[in-house]
Amino acid sequence: MSLTITKDNIFPKGYRGRLTEGVTYDERNNTLLWVDIIQGEVHRVFLDNTNINTNTSSSSHETLKWDSSNESIGAICLTNDPNKLIICSKYGLAYGDFSSSTIEYFFKYPHTTNPDEKLRLRSNDGIIDPWGNLWIGVMNDFPIGAKEGIQPEGKLYRIGFSKESNKLTCDVMIENSLISNGLCFNNQGDEFYWTDSLTFKIWKYDYDKTTNKLTNKSVFIDLKQFYPDVEQPEPDGLVMTNNGEIYTCVFSTGTILHVDNQGKEIERIKIAAKRPTCVTIGSGIKNNEMFVTTGHLKLDDEKATIDAINLDGDLGGFLFKLKVDKDLNGQKKNIWGGKV
């Protein structure tokens, strides 16, 4: 039976963003977190608080927001303190603290020493690897993309750490990317999967932790083969299961593609939003809930009203929760290994 996500799956009710992304489940305190990239916001809700199912604002829904309109947030990562996150922002990594409602940079990307690159690039998707290092992609910022089109100026960084000295290291793992997006490691840590959205592919690499090298690049899936009638079937955020299956949001198609560990299609989940952006698995007694973020159709229009009440038409900007009757077996989020 094919799965469909409709307005009945909107969660939490009463909230709608412009470009929601980076959805993350933290089992330590049963919370769901996500970002609105353009708004420069991080959101958190406690899933065991029944107030989040109402149409009114609730103390269970918390927000961290940059003060500067120049800022954006591409991804968030968990730390050893459930109230503190790493926020992957316009210029680098910041700590976000829900206890103090603050955001503060602690690391700037190497490219920000170049004034032109500092202006042109921003964070997009990122993860913590099985050893506690942070992998984050950067790409052209919105004004640059709107004016020039997305250029192959992106990079994928790996931010490492020393527990003894508290010093951070930064390696460029991939260069000249377009839209660095959904990424993950298999459970063994020797295979790395990485999305470059405008190539319409998810790429697979072998990874050697000892040498920190990516080798043997190959195509894991080519979205053009799955969506031959779609001009730009862009793979976006993804989640991997413990047996190597991948769910990837396919931007502009209103679907989430589910493939096995060989890249063969298992199913397509339809969603009532043309622009699904990110998916995660978590929550539920049987690990049987999936959460999806989406982008509003008018996300580029600063004057557009983002209406959380009107449920007519495309439902982009809402988050959705899908509960199924089986264990989805999703990988758990890794924790940043550096000091906080």
From Swiss-Prot:
Belongs to the SMP-30/CGR1 family. InterPro entries: 6-blade_b-propeller_TolB-like (IPR011042), SGL (IPR013658), SMP-30 (IPR005511). This is Cell growth-regulated gene 1 protein. GO terms for biological process: negative regulation of cell growth. Gene3D superfamilies: TolB, C-terminal domain. Involved in the cell growth regulation. SUPFAM superfamilies: Calcium-dependent phosphotriesterase. It comes from Candida albicans (strain SC5314 / ATCC MYA-2876) (Yeast). GO terms for molecular function: calcium ion binding; gluconolactonase activity. It holds the Pfam family SGL. The gene is CGR1.
